[in-house]
UniProtKB/Swiss-Prot annotation:
Family statement: Belongs to the universal ribosomal protein uL5 family.
Record organism: Halorubrum lacusprofundi (strain ATCC 49239 / DSM 5036 / JCM 8891 / ACAM 34)
Name of one Pfam family that matches: Ribosomal_L5
The protein's name: Large ribosomal subunit protein uL5
Keywords of this entry: Ribonucleoprotein, Ribosomal protein, RNA-binding, rRNA-binding, tRNA-binding
Gene from which this protein is expressed: rpl5
Amino acid sequence: MSESESASHEMREPYLEKVVVHMGVGQGGEPLADAEEIIEEITDQQSVRTTSKRTIAEFGIRKGDPIGVKVTLRGEDAHAFLDTALELADISKSQFDDTGNLSFGVEDHTDFPSQEYDPNIGIYGLDVTTTIVRPGYRVSKRDKATASIPSKHRMTAEDATAFLETNFDVEVTE
């Protein structure tokens, strides 16, 4: 197989595996309930509470306390949400990791078209993490017959940048 054929091979075409939307509140109670409501309205999906991994006395957090909410989006839901979220953020190369994942924050949830400011709730920010992979990545995650991904098939920050620029019409800055 020549160099140009391998570059356009269907197993080398990256795709959006998932988008994780996360809101860290740092405490339970009413602020956490408000965050759940906001994230469910923005994503149209049921949220899951996240718990603290360790006790931090300075913040009054005990291990196992609910301190945030998250939603995982896949398929068309992920594409639709990412289209909206990318318009609200300036993306730079430093927001990509070595394996092609992208993380960015949205400082104000009211920037989303479906949201309006409510003085009873206030303003919440949220984190968005995208996972961009190539077909065949499951072999490194499955339980049986796990295998490593060859270096030439792994995603890089440059591959992920090119994927976002072509599929989501985003300009990635230095």
